[in-house]
UniProtKB/Swiss-Prot annotation:
This is Large ribosomal subunit protein uL11. GO terms for biological process: translation. Pfam families: Ribosomal_L11, Ribosomal_L11_N. CDD domains: Ribosomal_L11. It comes from Porphyromonas gingivalis (strain ATCC BAA-308 / W83). GO terms for cellular component: cytosolic large ribosomal subunit. Belongs to the universal ribosomal protein uL11 family. Forms part of the ribosomal stalk which helps the ribosome interact with GTP-bound translation factors. Part of the ribosomal stalk of the 50S ribosomal subunit. Interacts with L10 and the large rRNA to form the base of the stalk. L10 forms an elongated spine to which L12 dimers bind in a sequential fashion forming a multimeric L10(L12)X complex. SUPFAM superfamilies: Ribosomal L11/L12e N-terminal domain (SSF54747), Ribosomal protein L11, C-terminal domain (SSF46906). The lineage of its organism: Bacteria, Pseudomonadati, Bacteroidota, Bacteroidia, Bacteroidales. Keywords: Methylation, Ribonucleoprotein, Ribosomal protein, RNA-binding, rRNA-binding.
């Protein structure tokens, strides 16, 4: 028989760096989840992605056990890495902070395709381009056909 799902928690944690301090500790402790066990499992599973911010969805059950799914890094963070910037523009419609190529957009879209709600790479590229535009990152050239 399947376990009864009590709820879900969504967090963004740096890979290989989960510890009981906020935001992890209070979020899990309030639900009665073993914080140290989660931290050990998360750090073991994400040691190859150390330092990258990773979204994680924790499903906890009525018996206080849990499962979690680690997703790919957010598009905004991947765009900042690709453009070698620390943050986006405060005024994205007026001031552009960086410029990237459609090839970089395609690479990010291919990486993120499993987490996006689209099925083809062109739609994913348009989503990534929209995020870039809202961050003040310009894209060189025209959309590839």
């Amino acid at each position: 028989m399947a376990k009864e799902v009590a709820g879900q928690i969504k967090l963004q944690i740096k890979g290989g760096a989960a510890n009981p301090s906020p935001p992890v500790g209070p979020a899990l402790g309030a639900k009665g989840i073993n914080i140290m066990e989660f931290c050990k499992q998360f750090n073991a599973r994400t040691q190859d992605k150390a330092g990258k911010v990773l979204p994680v969805v924790i499903t906890y059950y009525a018996d206080k056990s849990f499962d979690f799914i680690v997703k790919t890094p957010p598009v905004a963070i991947q765009l900042l890495e690709a453009s070698k910037q620390k943050s986006g523009s405060a005024e994205p419609n007026r001031k552009k902070v960086a410029e990237i190529t459609w090839e970089q957009v395609r690479t990010i879209a291919e990486d993120k395709l499993v987490d996006l709600n689209c099925f083809d790479i062109k739609a994913a590229m348009k989503m990534v381009a929209g995020t870039a535009r809202s961050m003040g990152i310009a894209i060189k050239g025209d959309f590839p056909e």
